[in-house]
From Swiss-Prot:
This is Putative NADH dehydrogenase/NAD(P)H nitroreductase XCV0587. The keyword Translocase does not apply. Its cofactor is FMN. It comes from Xanthomonas euvesicatoria pv. vesicatoria (strain 85-10) (Xanthomonas campestris pv. vesicatoria). Pfam families: Nitroreductase. SUPFAM superfamilies: FMN-dependent nitroreductase-like.
Length: 196
């Protein structure tokens, strides 16, 4: 493995990064969003399954489709954000495994009823959603992840007739510090972790 990141990089990714509630009126180009995915795709997932699917909602039409699914507290900031990413997962992800994991017959591990794949799709898709947040920060973007929305409405509007299910949303852009809440505390190591 390479050397540790310097303190400034760790600050940008973790210590001084904040969950944004407001963004500057600066668009995020499709090129930057493609660059973002090119980083996210390298994050590890079980059997290299990569079940996450991302919809980058940037247009007025896309935001109008999303609006009915948003909770009241999340609607205004989401509609104003330059980008809202629907982080979803494909419950038929195993169909891509002969290409993604050629070392073994990994597809056969997940053959059978879709319900048997749901847990793996959700778990590994969630990992990829976390990679998206960190990759966005690495590229100088700010992120505002949230789960205050109606999954069924999002699925009907964006994924009807597919095995893709929404997980959570992430607003992306260049953050406006005026929209930040005071920094909340975090659990200490001894509260959240232990050695065995």
């Amino acid at each position: 493995m390479s050397d540790s990141l310097n303190a400034a990089a760790l600050d940008q990714l973790f210590r001084t990064a904040r969950t944004q509630n407001a963004f500057a009126d600066t668009p995020v180009s499709h090129e930057v969003l493609r660059e973002l995915y090119e980083l996210v795709k390298w994050g590890p997932t079980a059997a290299n399954s990569g079940p996450a699917r991302f919809v980058f909602v940037t247009s007025a039409e896309g935001k109008a489709k999303l609006k009915p699914a948003l909770s009241e507290g999340n609607a205004a900031k989401t509609l104003a954000a330059p980008v809202t990413v629907i982080v979803a997962h494909d419950e038929d992800f195993h169909e891509k495994l002969p290409y993604l994991f050629p070392h073994a017959d990994a597809k056969s591990w997940f053959d059978g009823p879709r319900e048997g794949r749901t847990e793996s799709a959700f778990r590994n898709g969630s990992l990829q959603g976390a990679y998206l947040i960190l990759a966005a920060r690495a590229l100088g973007l700010d992120a505002g992840p949230m789960s205050g929305f109606d999954n069924a409405k999002v699925d009907a509007a964006f994924f009807a007739g597919t095995p893709i299910k929404s997980n959570f949303l992430v607003n992306l852009g260049y953050g406006d510090p005026a929209g930040l809440f005071p920094r909340s505390p975090r659990l200490s190591f001894d509260e959240a972790a232990r050695f065995e």
